[in-house]
Amino acid sequence: EDLTSLITKYKEKGYRDARVVSESVVYDKEINKINIDVNVEEGRKYYFGDIRFLGNTVYSDQTLNSLLGIKRGEIYNGVLLQKRIDDNTSPDSENITNLYQNNGYLWSSINPVEVKTENDTIDFEIRITEGPIAYLNNVTVKGNDKTNDRVIYRELRTRPGQKWSKDQVIRSIREL
């Protein structure tokens, strides 16, 4: 786990190809110390090149670029790129997937693809499949023994017939 974290830090600093070549742990009884040696091969430092969006019809390139917040010439950071596209660690963060899913596009998918690596620069295409708009069909309360269902329905932010919104579903769950 620590080695994975170490490599992730390298990748955040532009070293996309960083890898652990060798590792060793040696205990020295005489001085009661442990020596840990990790040999890392950094590889080349990379930078973001051109980033193009494909398949987007609902949102403009400008809107998606401002949400992505990554400019040509910045140090490559694959971890940041993934967070700006879809941050699984924070369901209500501002990222491209949430932009789509908060506006009805439940089945949208956004995939970054490296299309060209030249010298130290990586060009990307962000391939977007928007899919159809999803609407809430039915909201059902189950397992409720203490409160009248009507009270729960009143507090929900989601209603049948509304466009799907991941944010509103999460808020409803939190508030209940």
Model-flagged regions — what are they?
Residues 1-176:
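Periplasmic polypeptide-binding modules associated with outer-membrane biogenesis and secretion
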